[in-house]
Structure formats: C-alpha cells, structure tokens
C-alpha cells in the first residue's frame, strides 16, 4: 500500500497496513478498507461524517493532481491512497499516480501490469448466463452427436474389430479437449478477462506460447495414451502384438497432434472474437472447443488408424516413422513454450493433471471396449460421446467461470493462516446467493432439454442400434442428470480447494473434471444398458 501525505512530518500520526488504513486521531473512523488488496485512489475527507460507514463498493475519483500545502498549522493533512492491486500471480503491485501523469510501478518480474487496467467483472443474471451459454451448448451437443454417429459407423471397421484396443484410445483422445483445448480456452479466457491480452504484443505472446505448450502436451499425452491402451488390452487376455502396439502409438500421437493444433487455432479465434463483441469468453469458448473437438478427433483417429493398419501388410516402417516424426518435433515446441513466462510454469508443473486425467479416461475406454465389443450392447457406441461430451462441456464452463471469478476479485491465492473450511454442501453449490450458484443452476437445467434434443436428432438420423423407448429415455436422462450433479458439485469444491493451495484452477481443475465426466458417463451408460437388458427392454436390431 502506498501513502502520500501533504505534510510528511505528520506520518507518525498514521497507522498503515496491507488490509486497512485508519487515522490514529480519536473519533476518525477508517476511511477505506478492502480485504483483497484491490483499491483505488481516494482522499480521506476532512469530516468523519463523509466517510462511508457500511461495507461495499463506492464510486471513487482518481487523483491526478494535488493541491499546494497551506501555512495553517491546524489544517488536517490530506492523505491519498494510491492504487494497489493484485497481479496475475496474486502478488500486490503499487501504482503512484502523480502530477503530470507520471507513473511508478513496483512489481515482480512476472507482473502483467504494463497492460491496461483490466475491465470490471460483468454483472450477470441467470437469464444472461443462460442466453450466452445456450447456443454454444447446443453447438457442442450437435458436435458430440456427430461424433457419436461417426463412432457408431466406424465401430464395425476392420481396424476397430481386429485391434479392439483402439476403443480404449477413444475416451482418452476425446478427453484431450478437456486436458488441453478446454484448459487452453479457460486459460486464455481468464487472461482476456483480466486484461493480459489487451495489447497486440501481449496477445501474440500468449497465443504462441500456448499453442506450443499444447503441442508438447498433446504429443506426450498421445504417446502415454497408446501405452495405457496396450497395457489395458494386454491385461485381460495376455495377448501382445508388437505391430498393433506401434499402430496404436502412431495413430494416437498423430491424432493428438493434428487435432490439438486445429482446435487450438479455433479456440484463439473464438476468444478474441468474444472479447470484441462483448461476450464473456468463459461462456462460449469451452463449449465451442467441444463442438468440433469430438468430431475432429474421432474422425482423425478412425482415418489415421485405418490407413496405418493397411500399411501393416506392405510396409513395416511406416508406423514407426510416423511416431518418430511427431515425437522429434517435441523439442522445438518446448523451446518456444519456455520463452513465454505464462506457459513456462505450466510446461514444468502442468503434467500431473494431464497425465492423471488421461489415465482416468483410459479406464472409461476400457469400459467402452468391453461393452461395445459385446454385440448385445453395440447400441451404446452412439450415445457415449454425447453423454460424455455434454457433461464435460458443462463442468468445464463452470470451472472456467469460478476460476475467472477468483482471479478478477483478486482473492488471495495462498492465505497465510488459512482457516479450516468445510466441503461445500450440494445446497450451497446450487442454491447459494452468488453468481457461481446461479450459473450452476442454469447449467444443470440445460441437461434434460439438451439431451432430449440430441436423442431426437440421433433417432431422426436413424443412428445407433437402440430404439428410443420411454424406459430407455428415463434411464438415460437419470444417468445424465446424476453425472452432471456430481461434476458441478466437484467443480465447486475442487476449484476453490486448488486456489487456496496456490494451484491455478485453469491448468489443474478442468482435466480432472472432464476425465471424471468421461468415466462417470461411460460407467453410468454401461450400467443403464445392462439394467435394460436384464429387465427385458431389448431391441431386435441390436448390432445390425
């Protein structure tokens, strides 16, 4: 906190601190108090009656010039509280706005204070949140429907029937939109909202650093996902074929690399356009990331794996060369990502959530492999991307919004003496008075109508092998609602828990949440199909 006194000799009459400023003189109440370190210049009034007595936000006038000192001995010194706010790392920075518009900045070398002052948080109602989320949500949903139609078709292709481990790759690679693209969208949305992309130079630095970062992550995650698929495919029966293992590796790495590059470019365009038209990027970026993410990734996986499978008969070197080519590009992306401070930290510390999320999604892939491989449950393929995608999209929006809320309100990342905090209750998550509770209710209310629209679309396009009976729709909606309730509650707890421990939720929370969405969605859907089979709700066209 920076103080300026007209009479510096009277500084002993003042008591200063990081949390409050008050006069020691008797009868003068605190002039201004802000617990988050984000305050604006204010002159303490001469009369105590002019001081606001109730907490809240007040309209304050910035001081750009100061009056000359008088010769009167009894004149009370005027005190100017100069601008003090938290930077992107939660550390405080001080700006002294003096006469002639001179400015002095004190911050660490990671400060982003050179950009214009970030805009104030948007005041959002439930209606405005729903209006902004609805269209991207529907676009994302239709994208997952298209992905489901593709999976329903390609499940009968030779590569999927001969190398069934490819099914294990499906949730892991589709989950890349949560591990990488949605994390990228959340990270850039937060940066845009807090003013870190207001200048062209800062914007290009963020773009280049983040694109290089996701290419590194995509290559590594794609490689690890193929290893997980080989292990999960080998454990049940003990069969291992080197040719199939290299095929899985080449297909996974190539798909992850190309899909991440294409989706990353789309995300950057969406976020920049959202800011220009005055839309909160948190509401539109993550759903649009998923609207094309599943379709592009699944189409690439099917096409690349089919082409490489055909090469096994004629060329034993094609698959290893493809895998080696994309892996060899990794050092280049590492060098680019290291040059940008905002991505350097993620490059070193952001691997844990990505790798763990990939492992969680691979477990969901194992469930999908064992279920779809059974002809009695082949109808599950078309619905898996839909239920997983919708749940992941909604929880990614909520996590991104909570993270932006914490950043924009300058809440301390690490409290010096954190008080024990109980886990949030489901009632508080959905029926609290804050904007995050309102958004949770809006997102939950979109689940049932959205899934009904998507189910009708699949049925109209004659997709899948399952007749939409009333009992099937009831079980399907129950699974979808339960999945989203769990995910939204976990988002409320996880984002705040990570924030209090100094972890940036933009980088850590969304991979876990979308991976859990894949696991819960696939598990609940498989359970529904098994229950329906047991109670006799079976189709004569299953597997046709």
From Swiss-Prot:
This is Solute carrier family 41 member 1. It catalyses: Mg(2+)(in) + 2 Na(+)(out) = Mg(2+)(out) + 2 Na(+)(in). It is a multi-pass membrane protein. One of its GO terms (biological process) is pronephros development. Belongs to the SLC41A transporter family. InterPro entries: SLC41_membr_dom (IPR006667), SLC41_membr_dom_sf (IPR036739), SLC41A1-3 (IPR045349). It is found in: Cell membrane; Basolateral cell membrane. Na(+)/Mg(2+) ion exchanger that acts as a predominant Mg(2+) efflux system at the plasma membrane. Transporter activity is driven by the inwardly directed electrochemical gradient for Na(+) ions, thus directly depends on the extracellular Na(+) ion concentration set by Na(+)/K(+) pump. Gene3D superfamilies: SLC41 divalent cation transporters, integral membrane domain. GO terms for cellular component: basolateral plasma membrane; plasma membrane. Residues 28-55, 92-121 are annotated as: Disordered. Disruption phenotype: Morpholino knockdown of the protein results in ventral body curvature, hydrocephalus, and cystic kidneys. GO terms for molecular function: magnesium:sodium antiporter activity. The chain crosses the membrane at residues 133-153, 156-176, 216-236, 253-273, 284-304, 317-337, 347-367, 377-397, 441-461, 471-491, 515-535. Keywords: Cell membrane, Ion transport, Magnesium, Membrane, Phosphoprotein, Repeat, Transmembrane, Transmembrane helix, Transport.
């Amino acid at each position: 906190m920076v103080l300026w006194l007209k009479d510096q000799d009277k500084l002993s009459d003042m008591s200063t601190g990081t949390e409050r400023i008050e006069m020691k003189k008797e009868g003068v109440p605190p002039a201004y108090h802000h617990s988050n370190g984000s305050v604006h210049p204010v002159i303490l009034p001469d009369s105590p009656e002019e001081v606001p007595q109730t907490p809240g936000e007040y309209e304050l006038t910035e001081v750009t010039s100061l009056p000359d000192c008088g010769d009167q001995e009894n004149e009370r010194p005027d005190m100017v509280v100069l601008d003090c706010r938290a930077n992107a790392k939660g550390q405080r920075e001080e700006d002294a706005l003096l006469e002639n518009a001179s400015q002095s900045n004190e911050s660490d070398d990671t400060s982003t204070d050179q950009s214009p002052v970030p805009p104030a948080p948007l005041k959002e109602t439930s209606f405005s949140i729903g209006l902004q989320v609805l269209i991207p949500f529907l676009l994302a949903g239709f994208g997952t429907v298209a992905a489901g139609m593709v999976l329903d078709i390609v499940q009968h292709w030779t590569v999927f029937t001969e190398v069934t481990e490819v099914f294990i790759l499906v949730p892991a690679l589709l989950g890349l939109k949560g591990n990488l693209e949605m994390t990228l969208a959340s990270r850039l949305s937060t940066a845009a909202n807090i003013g870190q992309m207001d200048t062209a130079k800062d914007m290009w630095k963020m773009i280049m650093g983040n694109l290089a970062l996701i290419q590194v992550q995509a290559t590594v995650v794609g490689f690890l996902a193929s290893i997980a698929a080989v292990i999960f495919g080998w454990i049940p029966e003990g069969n291992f074929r080197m040719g199939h293992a290299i095929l899985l590796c080449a297909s996974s790495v190539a798909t992850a690399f190309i899909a991440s590059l294409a989706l990353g470019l789309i995300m950057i365009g969406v976020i920049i356009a959202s800011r220009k038209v005055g839309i909160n990027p948190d509401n539109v970026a993550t759903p649009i990331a998923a609207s094309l993410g599943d379709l592009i990734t699944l189409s690439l996986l099917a096409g690349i794996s089919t082409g490489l499978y055909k090469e096994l008969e004629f060329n034993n070197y094609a698959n290893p060369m493809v895998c080696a080519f994309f892996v060899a590009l990794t050092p280049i992306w590492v060098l680019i990502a290291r040059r940008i401070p905002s991505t350097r930290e993620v490059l070193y510390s952001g691997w844990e959530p990505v790798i763990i999320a990939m492992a969680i999604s691979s477990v969901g892939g194992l469930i999908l492999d064992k279920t779809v491989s059974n002809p009695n449950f082949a109808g599950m393929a078309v619905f898996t991307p839909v239920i997983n995608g919708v749940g992941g999209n909604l929880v990614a929006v909520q996590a991104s919004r909570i993270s932006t809320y914490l950043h924009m309100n300058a809440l301390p990342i690490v409290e010096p003496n954190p008080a024990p905090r109980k886990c949030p209750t489901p009632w508080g998550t959905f029926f609290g008075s804050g904007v995050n509770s309102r958004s949770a209710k809006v997102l939950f209310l979109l689940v049932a109508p959205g899934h009904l629209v998507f189910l009708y679309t699949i049925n109209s396009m004659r997709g899948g092998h399952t007749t939409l009976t009333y009992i099937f729709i009831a079980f399907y909606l129950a699974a979808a609602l339960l999945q989203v309730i769990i995910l939204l509650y976990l988002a409320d707890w996880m984002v705040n828990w990570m924030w209090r421990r100094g972890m940036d939720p933009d980088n850590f929370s969304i991979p876990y949440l979308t991976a859990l969405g894949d696991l819960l969605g696939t598990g609940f859907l498989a359970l529904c199909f098994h229950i329906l089979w047991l109670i006799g709700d079976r189709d004569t066209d299953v597997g046709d």
